[in-house]
Regions:
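Conserved catalytic loop/helix region of short-chain dehydrogenase/reductase
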Residues: 1-3, 43
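Alpha-helical segment proximal to the catalytic Tyr-Lys
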Residues: 20-24, 85
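Conserved SDR Rossmann-fold cofactor-binding beta-strand/turn motif
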Residues: 28-38, 80-83, 93-95
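A conserved structural motif in NAD(P)-dependent oxidoreductases
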Residues: 61-72
Length: 103
């Protein structure tokens, strides 16, 4: 867990520094931090995964469910679009409330 947390913190720091360094060139830099996403490779879809495991993972999210891949894609599309033309140097959470559940 320490390596994961350090990697995530490093990514956020890199985004902020790059945004400051190249913002004058009209280049935006952001990160998308997704929560648990219901994909074929998700732990909840692994062979032998139980309903209890799914309930546990969903329970970590304030919305009490995992994201659908399209929901994460929509967040990425927003960051890549002109709708976010004044957004830079940020780490956008699309985690269904996992980050607030732990505070």
């Amino acid at each position: 867990m320490a390596a994961y947390a350090a990697g995530k913190a490093g990514l956020i720091g890199l985004v902020q520094v790059l945004a400051a360094e190249i913002g004058a060139q009209k280049i935006r830099v952001n990160a998308l931090l997704p929560g648990g996403t219901d994909t074929p490779s998700s732990v909840t879809n692994a062979p032998g995964a139980t309903k209890e495991l799914l309930a546990f993972v969903e329970g970590l999210h304030a919305l009490k469910r995992m994201a659908q891949p399209e929901e994460i894609a929509n967040a990425a599309l927003f960051l890549a679009s002109d709708l976010s033309s004044f957004v830079t140097g940020t780490a956008m959470l699309a985690d269904g409330g996992v980050s607030i559940s732990r505070t």
